[in-house]
Amino acid sequence: MTYRKDLIASLIRDVPDFPEPGVTFKDITPLLANPNGYAAAISELVDTASRDVDVVLGMEARGFMFAGPVALSLGAGFVPVRKPGKLPGDVYSQSFVLEYGSATLTVHQDAVQPGSKVLIVDDVLATAGTVRATASLVEQLGAELVGVSVLIELSALGGREKLDRAGIGPVNAVLTI
C-alpha cells in the first residue's frame, strides 16, 4: 500500500456486532477527525474517479462526507441521495436490501439533467444494495452512470461481483478488505 492508503486504513476502526450481531461496522469517524487522513481519502477517491463527470451523487449519510469534496475537486456538481421524506418536491424512489435490513433512497426528479455523466461516491461497498439502488435512480433521471468510487470495499460480501453482473461500473475502491 501507499503512504496515503496506509494512513487511511489506520484511521478506520472495526466495531463488531454493530448495528446488529454478526455485522462488523467500519467506523470512519477517526478518519474524518484527522485532517491529513480525510484529505488523503478525498485525494485517493479523486485519483480513481473518471475525469469526465458532470455530477457526483452521494448517498445519505456517510456518502455525503466524501461525495461533496470529490465533486468540488472534479469541478462537478453534487447531488444528495436521501432517505424518504427528506427532500421537498417530486422525487424518484428506489427500495433495496442492505446487509442488515432494507431501505429506500430518493433523489429530486430535476436534480440531474438527462444525459449528464454521473459518478456515484460512497463510503463502503458491501452487498451493493445502496449502489444498485442509486444506479437505478441515475437511470430514472435519464443520466449516464460513468463509474462508482468507494472508500472501502468489503470483498467477502460480493458487492463488486453483483455490480459487474448488473452492468454497473467501473467500480473503484481505495481500500479492499
Swiss-Prot record:
> What EC number(s) is this enzyme filed under?
2.4.2.7
Q: Which PROSITE patterns match?
A: PUR_PYR_PR_TRANSFER
**Can you tell which superkingdom this protein's organism belongs to?**
Bacteria
List the GO biological process terms: adenine salvage; AMP salvage; purine ribonucleoside salvage
Q: Which reaction does it catalyse?
A: AMP + diphosphate = 5-phospho-alpha-D-ribose 1-diphosphate + adenine
GO CC annotations?
cytoplasm
Q: Which PANTHER family does this UniProt record tie to the protein? A: ADENINE PHOSPHORIBOSYLTRANSFERASE
What family is it from?
Belongs to the purine/pyrimidine phosphoribosyltransferase family.
Described by its record, this protein's role is as follows: Catalyzes a salvage reaction resulting in the formation of AMP, that is energically less costly than de novo synthesis.
Q: Share what the entry says about its subunit structure, partners included.
A: Homodimer.
What is the name listed in the Swiss-Prot or TrEMBL entry for this protein?
A: Adenine phosphoribosyltransferase
